[in-house]
């Protein structure tokens, strides 16, 4: 049993280590520290920090005969602050011997022991940590005095020690910092189910792992019908299902109107019948003024309208005096004027007036006098003759619109006037009266789609539409609550007879039954058929009999077997056969009885004029999957078709050369079961059935040897719609082959 070293032994070890590292020693040799091999620290779990408790066991150092340590086994002491707490430091140090020799002073000098000890130097920096030394042999020391507990050191690196005695409970410390979240614990055992609590509110749908099956609960009350969920994304196209037999369902309720689809492509301009005149639409907003148009041709002179009321008196500036015109023609004698006022009394006369003298010459026109005062308005004179047309004046201010005049007589068509300059655009006129509906024009091109208008009012309920095609299967919804048990339905109709199944394997032999009672003796049975036994052992030869009488002449015997083959004849000389004509078949070979076949169907004319012998043989492949049911399967891709006896348009092989034929077929199964039959003259001679497994591509094959005569037909056919999963693709081939074994 190892004894833990006390403080004196630890001091001795430390002094031995410090003295062993000094090179200058008077009586002894220096043993250098041999580097130790690298030690692999013990692997400990990462959750438990590596530590070394205080008071750990120091490895034992082997000693020499005189109690000194040997240099090669010098243990490595810990550096830094890892020294254990030593009470009464350097007070209980025992003298250490010097490698087996006492210290001898020099001649004439005596070195006191106290003088060898110098002053305590400053504490050096902790050196690097060395590798751990090899474990020493267990030492046997005297237990020392128990020292005072030292300060808590840094956690060491060592093996965990023996568990210590439980200490006194300390005072409650300050709450530590919140630690990191520990690893997730294992799932504990299922607890005892507690009492059922009140139903809580409906929570949000969570996403969790499926739990174990719970105990069956009591059926709850029937809940309200939930809202209709949005349609799920279209699923992948499933395999072709088997044809079902169901009763037609009731017509469904009319669904909500669908969203307005995008406008279709512009169609070709059609010519349709004129539609019914629609109601006038609401008045649109005022449009922007368009660019001024080109002046049109002058229209015919319109009917003069009724003279409007006189306008307001205008205020114009007086114009300049015009050039005096020529004197007009003398007017006619006017009417007698009114008698004038009596004049003043005249001067007294001188004499009587004389006779009037002769008319003198016309004098020069005098200067026009000043403008006299404006006379009174005379009576309206007779209309004068129309003067020459004056120059067109400036356009006046448009007057107010007068009342519509009566329709006058159409005037004569005037001459086309000179196109005047383009006037400024006039103000927008008032909307006129609605004209008569014009003739319907041709259907114009479809314009670009307009802005989507406001939703119109809800129209009347339409008639029930036709039943639509079944939609794509949606994503399976969440598992709903368990419904109430339904009413048992009526017994369904008996389905059609299914495909005959494959004969199952024979069951194991049952245990022997209990022997029954002894029966009565039966009636004697009819005589049995003559038995066929093995020939018995030949008996011994008897003595030779006496020669009998000569019998009648017998019938000629059967022909004997063919003799041995004769010597080989001279080599035959045959022209080479072109590549596309196949190999030579000399007269189609021998029959089964050794007789040559007839020459009626032995040869056909080849390209070079010689006979081209072909064997009735073919191989055809199917290129389209799922051929129709109840008709010959058309294997339409030919690999070889000798003598053209197979028709890829109908899928039927017609015999030309009588003989024994071999037929084989290879089909694939996908999306449903496969049941094919080999027919000879509309009669099935062989069936092949293969059951489809979801997710797998299976195959089936069959073959038969048939005796055919000229005109016989052979083909493959699907006899049932419930097993029509015959599949073919670009790299998955279903084939049909046949060839002549030997002619008859």
Curated annotation (Swiss-Prot):
Cellular localisation: Secreted, Extracellular space, Extracellular matrix, Basement membrane
Alphabetized GO MF terms: extracellular matrix structural constituent conferring tensile strength
InterPro entries (UniProt xref): C1q_dom (IPR001073), Collagen (IPR008160), Collagen/C1q_domain (IPR050392), Tumour_necrosis_fac-like_dom (IPR008983)
Region Nonhelical region (NC1): start-end pairs: 572-744
Biased composition (Gly residues): 203-217, 328-337, 411-420
Highest rank taxon of the organism: Eukaryota
Chief localisation class: secreted
Disulphide linkage map: none
GO cellular component terms attached to this protein's record: basement membrane; collagen trimer; collagen-containing extracellular matrix; extracellular space
Ranges for region Nonhelical region (NC2): 29-117
Extent of Pro residues compositional bias: 128-137, 288-298, 389-403, 558-579
Keyword Nucleotide-binding applies: no
Occurrences of domain C1q (ranges): 611-744
Signal sequence bounds: 1-27
Sequence ranges of Low complexity compositional bias: 168-190, 469-506, 540-556
PTM note: Prolines at the third position of the tripeptide repeating unit (G-X-Y) are hydroxylated in some or all of the chains.
Region (Disordered): 101-434, 463-584
Gene Ontology BP annotations: angiogenesis; cell adhesion
Biological role stated in the UniProt entry: Macromolecular component of the subendothelium. Major component of the Descemet's membrane (basement membrane) of corneal endothelial cells. Also a component of the endothelia of blood vessels. Necessary for migration and proliferation of vascular smooth muscle cells and thus, has a potential role in the maintenance of vessel wall integrity and structure, in particular in atherogenesis.
Subunit structure: Homotrimers, or heterotrimers in association with alpha 2(VIII) type collagens. Four homotrimers can form a tetrahedron stabilized by central interacting C-terminal NC1 trimers.
Listed name of the protein: Collagen alpha-1(VIII) chain
Protein species of origin: Gallus gallus
């Amino acid at each position: 049993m190892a004894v833990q070293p006390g403080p004196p032994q630890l001091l001795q070890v430390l002094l031995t280590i410090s003295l062993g590292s000094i090179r200058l020693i008077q009586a002894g040799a220096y043993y250098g520290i041999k580097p130790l091999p690298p030690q692999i620290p013990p692997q400990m779990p990462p959750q438990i920090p590596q530590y070394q408790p205080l008071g750990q066991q120091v490895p034992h150092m082997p000693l020499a005969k005189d109690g000194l340590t040997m240099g090669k086994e010098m243990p490595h002491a810990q550096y830094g602050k890892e020294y254990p707490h030593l009470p009464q430091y350097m007070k209980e140090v025992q003298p250490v011997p010097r490698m087996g020799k006492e210290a001898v002073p020099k001649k004439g000098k005596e070195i006191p022991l106290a003088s060898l000890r110098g002053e305590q130097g400053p504490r050096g920096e902790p050196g690097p940590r060395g590798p751990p030394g090899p474990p020493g042999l267990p030492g046997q020391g005297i237990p020392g005095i128990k020292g005072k507990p030292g300060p808590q050191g840094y956690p060491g690196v060592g093996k965990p020690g023996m568990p210590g005695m439980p200490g006194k409970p300390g005072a409650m410390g300050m709450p530590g910092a919140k630690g990191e979240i520990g690893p997730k614990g294992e799932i504990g055992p299922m607890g005892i189910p507690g009492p059922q609590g009140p139903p809580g509110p409906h929570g949000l749908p969570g996403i969790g792992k499926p739990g174990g099956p719970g105990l069956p609960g009591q059926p709850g009350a029937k809940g309200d019908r939930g809202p209709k969920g949005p349609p799920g994304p279209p699923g992948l196209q499933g395999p072709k299902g088997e044809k079902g037999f169901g009763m037609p369902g009731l017509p469904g309720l009319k669904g909500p109107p669908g969203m307005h689809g995008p406008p279709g492509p512009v169609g070709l301009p059609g010519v349709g019948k004129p539609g019914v005149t629609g109601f006038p639409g609401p008045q649109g907003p005022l449009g922007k003024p368009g660019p001024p148009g080109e002046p049109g041709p002058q229209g015919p002179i319109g009917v003069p309208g009724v003279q409007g009321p006189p306008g307001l008196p205008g205020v114009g500036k007086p114009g300049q005096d015009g050039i005096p015109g020529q004197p007009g023609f003398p007017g006619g004698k006017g009417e007698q004027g009114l008698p004038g006022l009596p004049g003043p009394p005249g001067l007294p006369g001188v004499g009587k007036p004389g006779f009037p003298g002769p008319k003198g010459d016309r004098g020069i026109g005098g200067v026009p006098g000043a403008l006299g005062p404006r006379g009174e308005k005379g009576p309206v004179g007779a209309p004068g003759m129309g003067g020459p047309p004056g120059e067109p004046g400036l356009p006046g201010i448009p007057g107010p619109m007068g009342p519509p005049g009566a329709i006058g007589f159409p005037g004569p068509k005037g001459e086309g006037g000179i196109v005047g300059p383009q006037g400024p655009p006039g103000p927008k006129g008032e909307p006129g009266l609605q004209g008569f509906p014009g003739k319907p024009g041709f259907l114009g091109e479809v314009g670009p789609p307009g802005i989507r208008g406001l939703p119109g009012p809800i129209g009347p309920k339409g008639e029930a539409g036709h039943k639509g095609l079944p939609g794509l299967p949606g994503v399976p919804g969440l598992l709903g609550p368990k419904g109430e048990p339904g009413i048992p339905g009526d017994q369904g109709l008996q389905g059609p007879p299914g495909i005959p199944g494959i004969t199952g394997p024979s069951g194991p032999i049952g245990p022997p039954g209990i022997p029954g009672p002894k029966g009565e003796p039966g009636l004697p049975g009819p005589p049995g058929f003559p038995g066929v036994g093995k020939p018995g052992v030949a008996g011994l030869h008897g003595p030779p009999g006496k020669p009998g009488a000569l019998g009648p002449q017998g019938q000629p015997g059967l022909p004997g077997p063919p003799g041995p083959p004769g010597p080989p004849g001279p080599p035959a000389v045959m022209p080479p056969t072109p590549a596309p004509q196949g190999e030579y078949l000399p007269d189609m070979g021998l029959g089964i009885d050794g007789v040559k076949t007839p020459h009626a169907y032995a040869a056909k004319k080849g390209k070079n004029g010689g006979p081209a012998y072909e064997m009735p043989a073919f191989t055809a492949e199917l290129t389209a999957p799922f051929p129709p049911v109840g008709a010959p399967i058309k294997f339409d891709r030919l690999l070889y078709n000798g003598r053209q006896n197979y028709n890829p348009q109908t899928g039927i092989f017609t015999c030309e050369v009588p003989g024994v034929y071999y037929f084989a077929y290879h089909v694939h199964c996908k999306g449903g079961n496969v049941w094919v039959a080999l027919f000879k003259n509309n009669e099935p001679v062989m069936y092949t059935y293969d059951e489809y497994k979801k997710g797998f591509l299976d195959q089936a094959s069959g073959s038969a040897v048939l005796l055919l005569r000229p005109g016989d037909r052979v083909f493959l056919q699907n006899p049932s719609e419930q097993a029509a999963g015959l599949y073919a693709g670009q790299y998955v081939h279903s084939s049909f082959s046949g060839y002549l074994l030997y002619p008859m």
